[in-house]
Amino acid sequence: MSYCPNTPEDIREMLAAIGKGSVEELFEPIHHTLRAKSFNLPAGISEQELLVKMQELAACDRHLINFIGGGYYDHHIPAVVDHLSGRAEFYTAYTPYQPECSQGTLQALFEYQTAICRLTGMEVSNASLYDGGTALAEAAMMALRITGRNRVVIDASVNPFARQIVATYLKNIGVEMVEIPTSSGSADRSALTEALTGDVAAVMVQNPNFFGSIEDLTAISQAAHAKGALLVTSVYPISLGLIKSPGEMGADIVVGDGQSLGNPLAFGGPSFGFIATTKKYIRNLPGRIIGETIDKEGRRGFVLTLQAREQHIKRHKATSNICSNQSLCALRGLIFLASVGKEGMVELANLNRDKAEYAKERLGSIRGVRVLNRGATFNEFTLELPKDAADVVRTLMEKGIAAGVPLGEYYAGMANCMVVTVTEKRSRGEIEALAEALEASL
């Protein structure tokens, strides 16, 4: 919002309206010891001087070759995403409750829902959630409502930050969260089968998981359904250009983080979460839902539908508790998907996979380094090093390379391991620079 200062005439008019003679009189009730004496601000400068100052500050930034993933990824963003999402018609925090005023926004969000359903292989989607972690937690709450049960089973190879969010949601409502240990970077199937008792509402997995491994979840889906539990799958959307959709593998609820779909890395946000499910569970879906309808004159239109689930009607019993501002990030996701297209998503996913495979082979050939992933990976993989991974990451950062995510903080016994991510933006030269720096640090 532009800064609009009050003119002396504005101030006089406002003071007269409330019966005050001066600004000093207006603030009289505030004790003088609590009032700011001076803001210690420098004098104003020109636009050109301000630009120079900002450039000086920007020059202080360190630009690293980025191999960090773990949930947020350094993908290319087409210029059209910024161009269209920045239009004034979209760039607003307004919730489109009045369909007669909001057809453009409503249609864009309707198309977003369609895109998410096509991407995940599911039947219905909402208009976005906060981020991937809260989307996973909302999926757990949704499964609890649907089944009426009080246990959730979650694979330890789900992103540790997302697991913490789920635990926070569940810890004070009498629900037990059971973590299944990992085995060589994948879910321990025998431990999962043992944990699947008759009171489990959901089995929660991630594919590809935090270590980068891809799994066929069909067997896990069948085991969960045999016990009356739902399968909740967290996915990395870019990977769905290459691997089988969670809907095809029997997932009941699919969630994920949309940062990789046209949203920049900006200190961890903002982003958006997505959630999709089957039609029979639509009334348990959190968040806003956009529906298509026909008006009395026979024209196609869009509205917020199933609003009885929302806060302004159900209050504390609402399943919808998501603010409007995430819609802008979701719009960026839609523009990204539309600009890349179906064939482009396949090409993008293959490019990520191919570059990661090259990096995995190159880094795995370094003496003392071992690739932990036994099966297929997408654009992330886990390395075991002959020394503490956090120390190695710090050393390589001094050389201008952000080498990966050390795992010692999140997994016991894995202090020597780190997850490396290779997106389409990383070049062969940058991968070689990582390999040489890593070899020199060991």
Curated annotation (Swiss-Prot):
Keywords: Oxidoreductase. GO terms for biological process: glycine decarboxylation via glycine cleavage system; nucleoside metabolic process. Its EC number is 1.4.4.2. Coiled coil: none annotated. GO terms for molecular function: glycine dehydrogenase (decarboxylating) activity. Pfam families: GDC-P (PF02347). It catalyses: N(6)-[(R)-lipoyl]-L-lysyl-[glycine-cleavage complex H protein] + glycine + H(+) = N(6)-[(R)-S(8)-aminomethyldihydrolipoyl]-L-lysyl-[glycine-cleavage complex H protein] + CO2. Belongs to the GcvP family. N-terminal subunit subfamily. The glycine cleavage system is composed of four proteins: P, T, L and H. In this organism, the P 'protein' is a heterodimer of two subunits. The glycine cleavage system catalyzes the degradation of glycine. The P protein binds the alpha-amino group of glycine through its pyridoxal phosphate cofactor; CO(2) is released and the remaining methylamine moiety is then transferred to the lipoamide cofactor of the H protein. This is Probable glycine dehydrogenase (decarboxylating) subunit 1.
